[in-house]
């Protein structure tokens, strides 16, 4: 009887496993951005962000306080498998995904 319960439990667990991968791909990024160029002038102000090519769905460069710059991938980490799952705006240090309405403090 114990063997039957054990086999049923293992079978149910094996059947219920989801094979869908729900993770962000690992992508090597090696970018150099010259912040003194005119196309990046809007990032000179603290609290501003720009979007550039690279990564999985693009790259966000965020200018924090002083000389603090942070870089993030634009792929939303809440539901990364959705095709619309992209950070589309950054306001006051909060990144927003228009697809799943997630907000991330950056």
Regions found by a protein language model. Name each.
Residues 13-16:
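C-terminal motif of bacterial Sec signal peptides marking the signal peptidase cleavage site
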Residues 18-92, 103-106:
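N-terminal pre-ligand scaffold of iron-sulfur
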Residues 95-97:
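Compact Cys/His-rich metal-coordination microdomains
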Residues 2-7:
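Sec-dependent signal peptide recognition
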